């Protein structure tokens, strides 16, 4: 999970890169933070997709009356 502080830092680096540019160290930090954020989003999306149940599957498993 990406913390609020890390998201804030990502946004600070984006703003700074647009206004004045980043040092090599800041570019590496930005790249690492972005990758961590992307990985967290992918993990969350995968968990949501894995929890989806199809209605047809549920209806087939019901006992017939």
Swiss-Prot record:
InterPro entries attached to this UniProt entry: DUF896
Provide the Gene Ontology terms for cellular component.
Answer: cytoplasm
Q: Where in the cell is it found?
A: Cytoplasm
Q: Which SUPFAM superfamilies match?
A: YnzC-like
Q: Which of UniProt's keywords are assigned here? A: Cytoplasm
Annotated Gene3D superfamilies:
Helix hairpin bin (1.10.287.540)
UniProt record similarity statement: Belongs to the UPF0291 family.
Q: List the protein's name.
A: UPF0291 protein BBR47_33060
Lineage, broadest ranks: Bacteria, Bacillati, Bacillota, Bacilli, Bacillales
């Amino acid at each position: 999970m990406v913390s609020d502080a890390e998201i804030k830092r990502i946004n600070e680096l984006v703003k700074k890169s647009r206004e004045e540019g980043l040092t090599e160290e800041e570019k590496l930090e930005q790249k690492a933070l972005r990758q961590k954020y992307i990985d967290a989003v992918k993990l969350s999306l995968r968990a949501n997709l894995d929890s989806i149940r199809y209605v047809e599957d549920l209806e087939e498993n019901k006992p017939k009356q």
